[in-house]
Design a protein with these regions (language model features):
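A short, structured beta-strand-centered segment in the mid-to-C-terminal lobe
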Residues: 60, 107, 136, 157-182
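Active-site-proximal acidic secondary-structure segment that organizes catalysis
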Residues: 1-47
Length: 182
């Protein structure tokens, strides 16, 4: 019995890449033990370094200026809100934290999916909307921005490339508190 351990830094590859890597290792292993006559690995015409080089040169000049102007306009007037805490903030922030896992009941999960379907949106949008309402209640603010990761693999050629493509998208909302919440 053998055990393969893989340690990767989150800046070297994203979650999408993890799936690609595991698929490639599985194909290669099956080839080695004779379960497959074909490696079945993607023959990528580009590597991550090619994408990185292209991106650095593509996003420059007038395109970069236009994108920066878009985000400056989109986030203009936004003021960071502070959430109330149950403990005093330390003078020296060490960024330590914890993970709290919550399991939704099958019924609640189904109700949320139905709500999404009835409103012609994704479950993600329903949950993000609830998060905005919660943040608004805690912060007493109706102008909110939340960063959310996006895959950033808009080109088909990147589908099987291992690398860190994730980008963070700032999603800003201004809640209308006169609207009822469903």
């Amino acid at each position: 019995k053998y055990l393969l351990l893989i340690n990767r830094h989150h800046i070297a590859s994203d979650g999408w890449s993890r799936v690609i890597l595991l698929k490639e290792i599985t194909h290669y292993y099956n080839f080695l033990i004779g379960k497959s006559n074909d490696l079945g690995l993607a023959n990528n015409s580009i590597q991550y370094r090619d994408y990185s080089y292209w991106q650095r040169h593509y996003i420059s000049g007038i395109l970069l200026e236009n994108q920066l102007n878009f985000w400056k306009k989109h986030l203009a007037g936004y003021e960071q809100f502070l959430l109330p805490t149950d403990k005093i903030r330390p003078k020296n922030i060490d960024y330590s934290g914890d993970t709290i896992s919550v399991k939704l009941s099958h019924q609640l999960s189904q109700n949320l999916r139905t709500l999404a379907s009835d409103n012609n949106c994704s479950l993600y949008v329903v949950l993000l909307s609830g998060f905005y309402v919660l943040l608004s209640k805690y912060s007493n603010s109706i102008d909110l921005a939340v960063g959310t990761p996006i895959a950033n693999r808009q080109f088909n050629q990147l589908a099987e490339v291992i690398g860190f493509f994730v980008n963070t998208l700032a999603v800003r909302v201004r809640l209308n508190i006169s609207e009822p919440i469903e």
